[in-house]
């Protein structure tokens, strides 16, 4: 959803003297800082919005039929179904492993690749889900449906990360943070899967050891049971923080 700054601020009830909205990518944080100055505090929420997930036209969920798009910004980049057509079996397997730790990456990559090369269309969420379901037909566990759904969720996550270059964006963002924070400035980052958390944890630790940060989060912060009850999508959330050296 795209709205004008004036409309957004009118809904909030205050203007840009108090709150300024900027529509941009995390990797452009340095450009925002150049315009508005360095920050005392940065809170980065890396999650996909519920509005995007629940919109079948965006293709983020296997639960709803729609185009296999997966772009966070539908006006930029290329949809997932186009990228899938150009991937080798090895490239697809690597994406599934690196982006979602997928245990069935080998057989899934082989079958998805074979389906596409045979001329079958894989352009909708439903078509991809059917391939995943057929690939795992060897599973006879009573919880097979649950296993298939969890696998589908990981596959969609892996493709979304690839389509939007989310890891590359995150690497750029965390590398630029020290340059846009004031001395003593703080940053908190909310991640939603292990790949993101590993990047944040590793970078914060390295920068603390080099003296960039005076302190970093030692133990990841998780939502309480009450928070998860109010918002089930918060279950996978992890938060890490860091304080820039003065």
Predicted region positions:
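S-adenosyl-L-methionine-dependent methyltransferase catalytic core, i.e., the SAM/SAH-binding region
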Residues: 1-246
């Amino acid at each position: 959803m795209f709205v004008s700054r004036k409309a957004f601020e009118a809904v909030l009830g205050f203007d840009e003297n108090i709150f300024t909205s900027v529509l941009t990518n995390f990797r452009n944080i340095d450009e925002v800082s150049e315009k508005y100055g360095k920050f005392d505090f940065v809170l980065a929420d890396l999650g996909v919005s519920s509005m995007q997930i629940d919109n079948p036209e965006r293709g983020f969920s296997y639960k709803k039929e729609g185009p296999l798009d997966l772009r966070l910004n539908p006006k930029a980049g290329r949809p997932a179904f186009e990228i899938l057509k150009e991937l080798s079996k090895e490239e697809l397997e690597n994406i599934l492993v690196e982006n979602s730790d997928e245990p069935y990456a080998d057989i899934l990559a082989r079958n998805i690749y074979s389906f596409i090369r045979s001329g079958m269309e894989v352009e909708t969420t439903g078509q991809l889900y059917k391939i995943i379901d057929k690939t795992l037909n060897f599973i006879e566990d009573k919880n097979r449906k649950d296993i298939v759904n969890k696998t589908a969720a990981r596959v969609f996550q892996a493709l979304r990360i690839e389509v939007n270059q989310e890891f590359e964006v995150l690497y750029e963002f965390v590398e630029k943070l020290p340059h846009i924070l004031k001395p003593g400035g703080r940053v908190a980052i909310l991640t939603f899967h292990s790949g993101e958390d590993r990047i944040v944890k590793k970078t914060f630790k390295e920068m603390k050891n080099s003296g960039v940060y005076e302190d970093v989060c030692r133990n990841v912060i998780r939502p309480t049971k009450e928070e998860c009850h109010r918002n089930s999508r918060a279950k996978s959330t992890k938060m890490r923080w860091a304080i820039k050296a003065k």
